[in-house]
Amino acid sequence: MRKGLQNLQTEEEKANAQYKILAVDDEEGIIDSLSIFLKRSGYNFTGVTDPLEAIEKVKTEHFDMLILDFIMTPLHGDQVVEEIRKFNKELYILLLTGHKDLAPPLETIRRLDIQGYCEKS
């Protein structure tokens, strides 16, 4: 293999690199898994375990997507979204949930204009 070939990015990775994704989950393992997957796919990824830090990051930096856990401390995902929607109505949000009863997350999705959800298993 020629030198430098391993450094070539696919067209998809180049396209993905322009997207900034922020994830917040109080489980470090989830952040680590998302980091590995999204960075390998070429995305510009930032992960945090503190919901308050996530709110501050969205205030001070541009992100194209927020992936967040539904149940966290000190704030639940719905509280994080309520705060973010006060100053950023355009951010695409994906809610992660390990909730067995999907009624609370689905009600939150409708109420807070969250674009999607994904179940943790």
What are these regions (language model features)?
Residues 1-20:
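Non-catalytic signal-transmission and effector/linker regions of two-component phosphorelay proteins
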Residues 19, 49-53, 75-80:
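Acidic catalytic/metal-coordinating carboxylates
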Residues 47-65:
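Acidic, metal-coordinating helix/loop segments flanking the phosphotransfer/catalytic sites
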Residues 59-61, 84-90, 111-112:
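Conserved phosphotransfer cores of two-component systems
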Residues 79, 86, 100-118:
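Alpha4 helix (beta4-alpha4-beta5 surface) of REC/receiver domains from two-component response regulators
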